[in-house]
Every structure is written in C-alpha cells, then in structure tokens.
C-alpha cells in the first residue's frame, strides 16, 4: 500500500493474480501513477535454430525452476523451432535434472518445496491434466522424495513437449514446449 500511494513513486509494474493486479492498478492509478499489470500472465520465449542452444537452455532452467518453480518472471512457455527442438529439449532436461532439490535452509538447494501439501497436490493435478490432454511429459516431477524430508512438499522440475493451444499446460502457468516449423507459424 505504501508504494501504491507514496508521492515519490511514479510507476508500478506487477505480475501476478488478477485480483491483486486490479487492486494495484486501481489504487496506484488513483494516485496518478503509471501502472503495468500483467495479470495471470504467462511469459513466452522463442527459440530459433541459430540460438546458442545449450546456453539458452541453462538460462531458461535457472529462470524457471528457481523459487520452487514459482517465479512470475520465468519463461514457462517456449515456442521452439522444429529444426532445433530435439537438441534444445535434451539440454533443458539435462539442466533440469541437475537441479538440487532439497530443504530451503540448505545453501546448496536450487529447488525447494512448494508452500503446502494442498499446493503440492494442485501442482500434481496440473501435471496429470497435461498428460490427460495429450501433452508429452518429458520430465516428471511428481514423485520426488528428498532424504530426511520424506513427507515434504517437493515437486521436481517438470517439462512437457508438444503442447498445443487450448491445452491447460499451454494456457496456464505450467512449463511446456510447443514445437513449430517456421517462425511465422507460431508467432
């Protein structure tokens, strides 16, 4: 609230839920601020065949699977050119599998638990829904067990391929790969 109303703040940028975004937008705008609110947004990335594929994959994995995989500025949706999709996907899987999943208090942990048992079940349900709708599950994070935290709320990196428009994995904030043959086909 302080930022939304403070006279020295000239603009606000927000990514997150619609209900919070509407509050931020209306409050900040009422105080004369410029507002950018991406509500229920899903960030997209394009990967072309001339990209530095391995370096791009590592950057995307670092972005996407930090903060227990709940980072609003991640790239959970990738449109990957068919000519490089298999190679790129192999790098994504390599780096996702290498993430250290563990207790949030361990400095070596790269992917901690989700917030609750209910949230874990919700994520597992989203993954199952993607499989039911026909997206190809390349890396399944549903059955992660962390030694010493067997009852923890851990979900590992999950990657879908062949996600199509209209699938839940493509429309909601779930990480998926959508292949295409040319830059104009998917843009």
Q: Where in the sequence are the language-model features?
A:
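ALDH superfamily catalytic-core signature
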Residues: 5, 11, 17-166, 186
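Short, cationic motifs built from Arg/Lys/His that form the positively charged side of catalytic pockets
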Residues: 77, 177-180
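Low-complexity basic/metal-binding stretches
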Residues: 171-172, 179-186
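C-terminal lobe/hinge of AMP-binding adenylation domains
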Residues: 165, 172-175
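A local structural motif
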Residues: 110, 175-178
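Short active-site oxyanion
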Residues: 9-12, 179
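Short acidic/histidine- and often glycine-rich active-site loop of Leloir-type glycosyltransferases
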Residues: 71, 170-173
């Amino acid at each position: 609230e302080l930022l939304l109303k403070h006279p020295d703040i000239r603009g606000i940028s927000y990514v997150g839920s619609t209900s919070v975004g509407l509050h931020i937008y209306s409050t900040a705008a009422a105080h004369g601020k410029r507002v950018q609110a991406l509500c229920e947004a899903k960030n997209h990335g394009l990967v072309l065949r001339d990209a530095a594929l391995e370096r791009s994959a590592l950057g995307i994995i670092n972005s996407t699977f930090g903060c227990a995989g709940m980072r609003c500025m991640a790239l959970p949706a990738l449109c990957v050119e068919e000519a490089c999709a298999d190679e790129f996907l192999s790098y994504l899987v390599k780096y996702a599998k290498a993430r250290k999943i563990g207790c949030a208090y361990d400095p070596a942990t790269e992917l901690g638990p989700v917030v609750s048992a209910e949230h874990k079940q919700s994520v597992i349900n989203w993954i199952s829904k993607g499989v039911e709708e026909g997206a190809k599950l390349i890396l399944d994070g549903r059955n992660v067990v962390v030694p010493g935290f067997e009852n923890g709320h851990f979900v590992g990196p999950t990657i879908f391929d062949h996600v199509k428009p209209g699938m839940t994995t493509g429309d909601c904030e779930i990480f998926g790969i959508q292949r295409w043959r040319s830059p104009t086909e998917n843009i």
